[in-house]
């Protein structure tokens, strides 16, 4: 029994490095399915092969919500850089054939909450509009990303303002991300259909 136990322990210790390597490889392979690169330039480079096969990408920047005004400014600058990079890579393919970008509104303002609605609308909307206009200049799609459920109404207010913005009239690159598992998803879809009709925009919807 003692020798059998020792042999099993030896095999167990000997197999640990292989198990670790296997787990590490598996995690890396899974990660590459969702994270294309550590920055936008790497992500664009790593996506070229799939794009040539007909895949379309909407790029998100991973990160948390802004906690301070300097955080929000850094995220704003990062989004501007990303839109320039994606726009150049898109090479005027248009909002349906080329890549796009998703924006996390809570990254653009440190107080993105209903309690601060007046301040948020006054301070965040000009930043959001500037990014959307930049995307329009490159003709790449730009989606407002999903946030926590209590922020949905505020996101919709900002979306509606964009849809009726005169400088964006006739452009169909505005999009919105829906959390399909929420109970109010059907009502939200109806609202977005109605908004598209009222504003004469074909909205880009992503689940």
Descriptions of predicted regions:
Residues 1-207:
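Positively charged, amphipathic and often flexible ligand-engagement surfaces
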């Amino acid at each position: 029994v003692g020798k059998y136990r020792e042999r099993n322990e030896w095999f167990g210790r000997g197999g640990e490095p292989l198990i670790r390597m296997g787990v590490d490889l598996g995690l890396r392979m899974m990660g590459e399915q969702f994270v294309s690169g550590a920055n936008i330039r790497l992500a664009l480079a790593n996506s070229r092969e799939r794009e040539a096969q007909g895949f379309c990408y909407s790029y998100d920047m991973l990160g948390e919500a802004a906690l301070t005004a300097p955080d929000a400014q850094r995220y704003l600058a990062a989004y501007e850089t990303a839109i320039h990079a994606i726009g150049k890579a898109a090479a005027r393919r248009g909002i349906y054939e080329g890549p796009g970008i998703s924006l996390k509104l809570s990254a653009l303002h440190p107080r993105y909450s209903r309690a601060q609605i007046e301040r948020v609308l006054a301070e965040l909307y000009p930043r959001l509009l500037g990014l959307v206009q930049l995307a329009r200049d490159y003709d790449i799609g730009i989606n407002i990303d999903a946030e926590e459920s209590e922020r949905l109404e505020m996101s919709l207010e900002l979306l509606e303002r964009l849809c009726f913005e005169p400088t964006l009239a006739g452009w169909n690159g505005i999009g919105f991300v829906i959390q399909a598992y929420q109970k109010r998803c059907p009502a939200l879809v109806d609202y977005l259909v109605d908004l598209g009709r009222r504003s004469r925009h074909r909205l880009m919807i992503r689940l």
